[in-house]
Amino acid sequence: MKLGLGDGTKVDPLLPVVEEVVAEILSEGPIVAPLEVLVRLEIIETDQVEAWRAGGLPYLERGITSGFSKVSRLLRLTREHCTSLGLKPTPGKYQRRGKGKKHPLRFSKRGDAESEQAYSVHFVRPVTP
């Protein structure tokens, strides 16, 4: 099965990179988070993620160093590849760290449900009995 450009005829050149990063993450544990894929691909730096989690950035996209069309492609490829591996999409929960009330964190400037879900979903390897 070819993934990437939607028409089944060409493979997105970013797909092999996503496949490699997903394999690396799965070698360390059963969960793939798109945010971790973006960090490992150096699309966003760890210190920016920590600033966002602490409330220092109003939304995660503010710290992203790459173009948003590339980020969108990477999120889509991550989702497609993880589902092709049989990983189960599970809602991720991201809340502000630190003292005080734990507010949900925003990923995108717009805050629309589709964008938020693309960033926050986790893909989990099914448990085999």
Predicted regions and their residues:
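Long, low-complexity, charged/polar intrinsically disordered regions in eukaryotic proteins
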Residues: 1-5
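Intrinsic-disorder-associated interaction segments
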Residues: 7-11, 15, 64-71, 112
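Positively charged, polyanion-binding regions of nucleic-acid-associated proteins
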Residues: 11-35, 44-45, 50-63
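An amphipathic alpha-helix signature
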Residues: 34-38, 75
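Phospho-regulated, low-complexity intrinsically disordered regions of nuclear gene-regulatory
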Residues: 47, 68-129
